[in-house]
Curated annotation (Swiss-Prot):
Disulfide bonds: none annotated. This is Phosphocarrier protein HPr. The active site is at H15. Belongs to the HPr family. Induction: Transcription of ptsH appears to be regulated in response to sugars supplied, i.e. is four-fold lower when cells were grown on lactose than when grown on glucose. General (non sugar-specific) component of the phosphoenolpyruvate-dependent sugar phosphotransferase system (sugar PTS). This major carbohydrate active-transport system catalyzes the phosphorylation of incoming sugar substrates concomitantly with their translocation across the cell membrane. The phosphoryl group from phosphoenolpyruvate (PEP) is transferred to the phosphoryl carrier protein HPr by enzyme I. Phospho-HPr then transfers it to the PTS EIIA domain. Phosphorylation on Ser-46 inhibits the phosphoryl transfer from enzyme I to HPr. Residues 1-87 form the HPr domain. The lineage of its organism: Bacteria, Bacillati, Bacillota, Bacilli, Lactobacillales. One of its GO terms (biological process) is phosphoenolpyruvate-dependent sugar phosphotransferase system. It is found in: Cytoplasm. GO terms for cellular component: cytoplasm.
Length: 87
């Protein structure tokens, strides 16, 4: 299992557009990928799950991946987070 912590700097947090991009990125991988926020973990491949967390600016989240391509998945998600100005 691999995991990485992120501090959300985007003014709007993880709203619909970046959430969609994160879900699309995560869905490219076979690994199980979760987003943890305030003690609640959701499947990062589920737009409803990600949106239900209401992650705002200044939040600290952890993304974890478990599976054969976990490291590649985390690297791609980190790239998306950076490219979209989320973290």
């Amino acid at each position: 299992m691999a995991s990485k912590d992120f501090h959300i700097v985007a003014e709007t947090g993880i709203h619909a557009r970046p959430a969609t991009l994160l879900v699309q990125t995560a869905s490219k991988f076979a690994s199980d990928i979760t987003l943890d926020y305030k003690g609640k973990a959701v499947n990062l491949k589920s737009i409803m799950g990600v949106m239900s967390l209401g992650v705002g600016q200044g939040a600290d989240v952890t993304i974890s991946a478990e599976g054969a391509d976990a490291d590649d998945a985390l690297a791609a998600i980190e790239e998306t987070m950076t490219k979209e100005g989320l973290a």
